Amino acid sequence: MTIIYFILAALALGILVLIHELGHLVVAKAVGMAVESFSIGFGPALFKKRIGGIEYRIGCIPFGGYVRIRGMERTKEKGEKGKIDSVYDIPQGFFSKSPWKRILVLVAGPLANILLAVLAFSILYMNGGRSKNYSDCSKVVGWVHPVLQAEGLLPGDEILTCNGKPYVGDKDMLTTSLLEGHLNLEIKRPGYLTVPSKEFAIDVEFDPTKFGVPCSGASYLLYGNQVPLTKNSPMENSELRPNDRFVWMDGTLLFSMAQISQILNESYAFVKVARNDKIFFSRQPRVLASVLHYTPYLRNELIDTQYEAGLKGKWSSLYTLPYVINSYGYIEGELTAIDPESPLPQPQERLQLGDRILAIDGTPVSGSVDILRLVQNHRVSIIVQQMSPQELEEVNSRDADKRFIASYHSEDLLQILNHLGESHPVEVAGPYRLLDPVQPRPWIDVYSSESLDKQLEVAKKIKNKDKQRYYLERLDAEKQKPSLGISLKDLKVRYNPSPVVMLSNITKESLITLKALVTGHLSPQWLSGPVGIVQVLHTGWSVGFSEVLFWIGLISMNLAVLNLLPIPVLDGGYILLCLWEIVTRRRLNMKIVERILVPFTFLLIIFFIFLTFQDLFRFFG
């Protein structure tokens, strides 16, 4: 099937080129220009045939095409009465026609691509649009960069506007910050659990070339049976069911996989605390006792507690909380790091004198012995939501945010949370279930050696030594990262904007990309050439016809915008020359024109080769 998809992808690209060149051909003939050849592809011809004075050919390099019109590329030509000195005097030549007729011919190619895009998007619209992951078009934030989080933006917040414009998805924030260097966001915080709903705004300087991606969209974290749990998964005995959605972990409402990864990789204990008549949860750092400053008395007390807890490990590997905790679990003081230049991780809320620890990682404790024993290993507390068939149905993207926010049922969740850490917790409330605490395992212990071997084989194929070393270093670090050994997916939504909206959005994105390239905010290495386009179309065919229609429309529209740019060699460059003739009412000096065209032709070829090599490098690693 892969070969079939590749053939279909190449065919789709050929159609895009054919439509563009056909636009030039039809209008050129209509205004009386003599067309010498019509080619799909460049280089030596694989097939050619002359029909009606026009040589139709298919080149051996299939990425592109051209229409050769008489007199367009020559300064001198022989006519019936001898040598013709000017391209303007060539019968039926390109320059023999008025500038307005030439502009019609030049515009016809991009216009044909625009019409193809309109057709593709219209069929897509009438067919109901395409399926996208909810996170791709979510106004709700799933993950936030620390720079924005410090300004008050949190996961779960709904963004209303970005720099004065309606917010559609995380791509808006990335492109806006890329071009303008700052973000002005109007935000709505829904009333999750006991948090009151409110609206507010932030204004912050943000450079994605320095900080990276500002945020990502919220996602349903759904467990399906398509990818079964691995044999050594920590979740193997957790009674997880198909269509369970992860909604809460260690005191955090979940909106993205990034949050889960952060919770697993941070060395924190989930602590239930009593302070006077108030009970609350707080994530507290688990730190090695060897990095804390103890008086001899406190050190001996901790060693005694270690003995009572049955912990036989060395002092250098003993974990604890950075507090002085008496035998009943009360906080009697706070400990500091031995090395002031290596500060301790910050707690979610600092514990105070007289606070009492009631539970660690969802397990009740009676005193310091239980506390010390439980903090040696982090076990995550997880609440899942069993999704009903109605909740799994695909909805229109316009209604998706409202449904997502409403899917967190505070009353049922609070029933479980209010009794968490007790000897008889509430394990089920409405669609929610509290799973038994789960201890993550290192990735290397969860997944088979075959998975590691496959990734090592991928690394060996990377030709660039620096990138290969970076990949291997990342792989080595990933091996030890805590994992639940589970694959979670997002829900699909139906994305079906009108063809006009699609055309407008793609045009804006194309111009934004070009602006980012010119200003240096975007590297050319992120662009795709013909090989990349074929690869994208190949992926589209493997997903479905709707996806192919979208990519054909998008690429066709991008081709139209690109060709209309006022750059010599492109259609837009020739249009600019024609407009110059109209304004000045003087013929062009073809020698000067050629001097302008030659270097730009050379640069275009170099750029084309660069993009092709970039595509091949990405494709083959």
Curated annotation (Swiss-Prot):
GO terms for biological process: proteolysis. The keyword Glycosyltransferase does not apply. InterPro entries: PDZ_sf (IPR036034), Pept_M50_Zn (IPR004387), Peptidase_M50 (IPR008915). SUPFAM superfamilies: PDZ domain-like (SSF50156). The active site is at E21. GO terms for molecular function: metal ion binding; metalloendopeptidase activity. Keywords: Cell inner membrane, Cell membrane, Hydrolase, Membrane, Metal-binding, Metalloprotease, Protease, Transmembrane, Transmembrane helix, Zinc. It is a multi-pass membrane protein. Its EC number is 3.4.24.-. Zn(2+) binds at H20, H24. Signal peptide: none annotated. It holds the Pfam family Peptidase_M50. The chain crosses the membrane at residues 103-125, 561-583, 596-613. This is Putative zinc metalloprotease CPn_0344/CP_0416/CPj0344/CpB0350. It comes from Chlamydia pneumoniae.
